[in-house]
Amino acid sequence: YITEAGGKRLRPLLVLLASKELNYEGKKHVKLATIIEFLHTATLLHDDVVDDSSLRRGKITANSKWSNAASVLVGDFLYSRAFELMVDVGSLPIMGILSKATNIIAEGEVLQLSNLGNLDLSEQKYREIIRCKTALLFEAATHSAALLSCPDETEKELLDDLRKFGLHFGVAYQLIDDWLDYAGDSGTMGKNTGDDLAEGKMTLPLILALQNATEREQACLSLSLIHISE
């Protein structure tokens, strides 16, 4: 089910591209890309349980097809398998990057959950949420690939540039994803649209809508979100 679930595989692709850019000649970059994809897939399995999602990449989600318990357990397995593979890569700095990213991703999910229906959520706080829950794994992908390719860190400026690229790429990715939840087509995207609003998630389109709405429009949106949060 997981291997046939589709998806863009952007995060592992960034690992391979960054390794190629730095002329890495070994084989551990493939294992590193696998680790990144395992971590990402684990977060998706858990997210679908938290969000009670029924559609992912055009297919029925694992929690809908089997059960929440099965999804959580398989997600846990992928996390543990990812860390087992980290040991095989044999780099403490890379393990540090990936373990820290995994921890911050969980913090970001909790931060988002605790702000459902929060009409006062600022754009700055929203950006912090997407940095934690989404962009950090993109950053970890390019940063860890850079360290794998240059373990002595002789190209510090290039390593930092690749790390920043991953971070900014991840932020841009989430901004577009949040916009598509309002403006996209569910058939094209392979997932439901309107879920963020239905779940009371304060994403940038909704934050900006509240900022630019008339008093009547703000009241209507506020009542809807209060009803959802209850």
Language-model features, listed with the residues they occupy:
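Mg2+-dependent prenyl diphosphate-binding active-site environment of isoprenoid biosynthetic enzymes
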Residues: 1-218
